[in-house]
Amino acid sequence: MALAAELIRAPSVTPHADDALELVAKRLEAAGYRVERLTFETGGVPIPNLYARIGTDGPNLCFAGHVDVVPEGDATQWHHAPFAGTVEDGVLHGRGAVDMKGAVAAFLAAALAFGRPQRGSLSFLITGDEEGPALDGTVKVVEWLKARGETIDHCVLGEPTNPDALGDAFKVGRRGSLSGILTVKGVQGHVAYPHLADNPIPRLLKLIGDLTAAPLDHGSDFFPPSNLEVVSVDVGNPVFNLIPAQATARFNVRFNDLFSLESLKSEIIRRLDGAGLTYDLAFQTGASQSFLTAPGPFTDLVASAVEEVTGRRPEPSTSGGTSDARFIKDICPVVEFGLVGRTMHKVDEATPVKDIEALTAIYGRIIARYFSTFA
């Protein structure tokens, strides 16, 4: 808990996470870890990351996380200063307590208590670019690991996975995400002379209707149904007497393992083409594929460790938004387990100290069981 409070007292609003990351690096170096400080600058701002490892042989169990946080908002609305790391009545208060400095501190404490594995390796992948664009964070560290032939066999990501109580759920996969911009062009004109104009809005509404009329699917064994949401419809017209020249809709799809990115794009185009209308469609960069860490010894190990400490067997889940697991899954199986997420990103973010202590115990059991199972 003391380390979690210290991390909170190192303000690290994305992308300025250097001080918080250095706290982690120094503790790992003191414990004998080989620490690589990695800075990437694709987006124009230097982003700090670290990869640290103790041991040289496999298997390599990695903890992944981030120390950057979202802004605190209006600090006067907080009952405790957002970067003071205050503990009151058994609760740790501050930005990042839940998401996710508490989990970083818990795994660090568990790993240092475990020491150097007799066989195999322990490692950390910690970024300062998860809450921001995520261009120079975990995705770049994964590329760096691939380039140098560094192998990670399994990974635990410390995102807050529990909706209400520690032990509710752990993430075994994530839905994919695809965004698009749909545009219909017309001819601008005066509303009193519609025959001299061409209103694109009715055609856009027809396309939206065809796009959303039927479910994309009905879900799979591990995922809920894929979901397409239209998030904006824009014509850029603030007046009442002008027919607009074009109309645009933006949409996002969260999709399951029944689709690949390409098959989903094909289905969207098929539905739009069925309307028999002319349109422009631009899929946005940054799309991600769904993934699943299949049930097996690793997921059982994590679930059992949670159950031993909390008394409840966590439900495997694929709900929620995206996380850095979408990058890590390219190099190894990954599961996510952390604190209770009710206050993440909110004013008065906080977590009970007992939850951090229990999470430390869970991570300790995961580490011990991992090397007795896989090493």
Swiss-Prot record:
It catalyses: N-succinyl-(2S,6S)-2,6-diaminopimelate + H2O = (2S,6S)-2,6-diaminopimelate + succinate. It is an enzyme of class 3 (hydrolase). Zn(2+) 1 binds at residues 66, 99, 159. Its cofactor is Zn(2+); Co(2+). Its EC number is 3.5.1.18. Belongs to the peptidase M20A family. DapE subfamily. This is Succinyl-diaminopimelate desuccinylase. It comes from Xanthobacter autotrophicus (strain ATCC BAA-1158 / Py2). The lineage of its organism: Bacteria, Pseudomonadati, Pseudomonadota, Alphaproteobacteria, Hyphomicrobiales. The gene is dapE.
